[in-house]
Regions:
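Structured, helix-rich domain cores that form ligand/interaction pockets
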Residues: 1-282, 286, 290
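Helix-turn-helix DNA-binding segment
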Residues: 288, 293-299
Length: 299
């Protein structure tokens, strides 16, 4: 599987045109991924009572839960909340929800581990056996895939150069960045700091599909997760999304800035590098046209 991932990445890189953003020095993150392990991380499951009329989900699943709370809803119907090996579980007379936990962590005790499809199958079948539910009828409502990349430099240096992903909203926070839509999210953060490994430059890349049915155009069942063709489709979607991230070729040389003039010059160079010279020139011409600048400013 690792070789398969590697081949897909090299094919993706070979299609880059000269000068394309993803072919800058920061394509090294793509090359580093050859040495990482793409895996399923957080996966949320749902099973509807109508799909398993032969099973009383509330009665069947409730006894297996830890930290169990038996409640009555506003509709007067009973429901139960509890924990199952790291997962949050909610079950009532209509639906069973199993969510908010890494499938990899459920199986290995950590989400930093190679997770071959055979083990994905064992993990999913294990959930079904423990809770006595048919996993082939369980649907996936959220699906995160992830990869850890060991880098030569601080992950933040890479993240700061990731400028834009078309049709996604970019948000940044102290340890990483995320590109979001209502359906999907591409997230990068410093996994080394999260793990307390300050001496290691480990970046975590996560591809989150928050609306699985809408994204794939069909229901995705738990048993599909370990199907190689489905996994390859997911990899293609991830690589397609990742390859569209626009990155800058250079960052501001903060260690060499010792005055306001140099700062302004560097900021101007950085703007041109990120956006090209044409938008800057067009902006100057517009200001000349509007009388805000003299004609000589554009010469």
């Amino acid at each position: 599987m690792k070789d398969e991932i590697a081949s897909k990445i090299y094919v993706n890189l070979s299609r880059c045109e000269k000068g394309h953003d993803s072919c800058t020095e920061y394509s090294s993150m793509l090359h580093d991924m050859v040495h990482g392990h793409m895996l399923y991380d957080t996966v949320d499951f749902v099973l509807n009572q109508k799909d398993v009329p032969e099973i009383d989900l509330l009665a069947e699943v409730s006894p297996y839960l830890m930290n169990r709370s038996d409640c009555i809803g506003n509709d007067g119907l009973p429901y139960v909340r509890g924990k199952y090996k790291g997962y949050n579980v909610y079950v009532n007379t209509h639906i069973l929800k199993i969510n908010a936990c890494s499938l990899c962590k459920y199986y290995y005790g950590t989400n930093m581990h190679d997770f071959p499809l055979e083990d994905v199958r064992k993990a999913i079948e294990g959930i079904g056996e423990d809770l006595n539910i048919p996993m082939d009828k369980v649907t996936v409502t959220r699906m995160d895939s992830a990869m850890d990349l060991e880098l030569q430099r601080s992950p933040i240096e890479y993240f700061n150069r990731m400028l834009d992903l078309p049709y996604f909203r970019r948000l940044s926070y102290p340890t990483g960045i995320t590109f979001q839509t209502a359906e999907k999210e591409l997230l990068f953060y410093d996994k080394g700091k999260e793990q307390g490994s300050n001496n290691k430059n480990i970046a975590r890349c996560e591809f989150r599909i928050k609306k699985v049915r809408k994204c794939f155009g069909k229901s995705v069942t738990a048993s599909m997760l370990y199907d190689p063709s489905f996994w390859n489709d997911l990899l293609d979607r991830f690589l397609s999304c990742y390859s569209k991230v626009k990155v800058s070729k250079e960052s501001l040389p903060l260690d060499k800035i010792n005055g306001i003039k140099i700062l302004k010059d560097c900021a101007l160079c950085d703007y041109v590098n990120r956006n090209g010279f044409d938008p800057l020139r067009s902006g100057f011409k517009a200001r000349v046209r509007d009388g805000e600048l003299a004609q000589r400013a554009c010469k």
